């Protein structure tokens, strides 16, 4: 099912059958050699967060010592933060050394040498980037951050229970020995209602791995230029924010407030209760009411200045390049360039002038408890890519960042009818329904599900035996979109885009479509043949090109079959917001355009992320859709409601999302006993 789900969309970029075969052979290797490589990769990373064996001996003579100079700048006990630019030079050097290895065996030998010299987390990040981007490792499974650092995702009480059992030497054969399904409900903190979302293992792992697929430190000298990387930064984080808003509204909470003033107290406190057992690093608690403070080399005023420069360039239409020239951002590439500026990645037009707004805000927020290092306090979760999305402040900050992108989008003209409708074909959406597996038409049920996370043997807290941890997450029933489309011309290929958004705002009022578009979540994107006359298209929720399967999160990675997966994508069990017991009305929107008009022409030489192409793009791959991400809801809409805005190739339906409150056991739960 997983391979079929993306074939329809991935095929957009494949020009001829021979090319398709070549790419598949390159990216989807299942032979014995690839299995050997995967075992070697897993062997390298397996010891990153574990004590090094006293018998280990690093290879000698595989790399000149002078090439290793400068490595080890970041101390081993510290957290590696991709947000902290001070780490970028060392991380970039490690990535380059790993990519420059002449063949796979040399790559493994170089990795064995480097991992002893550098910070463990920095090595894991650089090694993962290299595995994803080397030609001789594409298509292989990349180690998942939660497999290597489960203590970044499991709270201290769970880790301590694992440690107690391990110290007793008890052996349990595939039994979930630790129950971590308790979700707190602290009525003193409204955000505790969102713990199931904020602290979800798959969500936070996705955020980390997305930054592996699209590294801020990537430059064209390392390989092919990343296609639409800046736009992906905008769109993926915009979608994380929109999904967070839907979860808040499902729980009767107002949308999150935008971060606005650097001198205002932050009302939301956050206590992560996570620490790294091997090093003792404990993520700092942020009490409510704290105010962001200057760092020794980074005053808040610098952040304000960078933001003003970006906004001035947006409103004036003139951007300053590092070579001293000025230029206007065009409609097609403007959002991509702006994304690189705001992130700010090494491909920013002018990092000296526009600075590093997004990343350094994470650093300032992460060091709020001890900005000068006076008390030796560890940083908070906002400092770490793997943990930052746990904090409600993450979404307030990204709403601020998203507003900058919307300032740019608001300078673009609304789409015309001609731009919204196919020019060489006539499609009419005549009806849409959503059919749940067990519920009434246009109703989708959600519930809790337990899943088993394997914690491997050899950690400080699992020295003697592996363990299973039972975790609790949201889940929804399978459902099918049924879309009736009339094609009034010859046989064509339709390009389907599906979005969803809450029907009412937090006051119970119908949205102005221009406000509703800002919280649209992308549900799916795919192509389908449309024959003359009426066509009934059925699309299953499991096939979404937005999501990665829960098996990619919870299954033993060594047992997964490599299908060119990037382990990137939104967790499939979070595709639908929680909803509520009464029924949370969501509007599902569909637009059908002509694939021939939207496809990207030209050969491609890389691999796509087959598990979630829409959110993650590809490795060395052109994104196979020339339309802006979020089309047709990415630009301002002057009409008041959807009915006034829509064209004949669009439609919508209201769907009730009902939370049942039930809890479903893992599919293989009984097999563990």
From Swiss-Prot:
Its main location: secreted. It is found in: Secreted, Extracellular space. Glycans are attached at residue 323. One of its GO terms (cellular component) is extracellular region. Belongs to the tyrosinase family. Hemocyanin subfamily. Hemocyanins are copper-containing oxygen carriers occurring freely dissolved in the hemolymph of many mollusks and arthropods. This is Hemocyanin subunit C. It comes from Scutigera coleoptrata (House centipede). The gene is HCC.
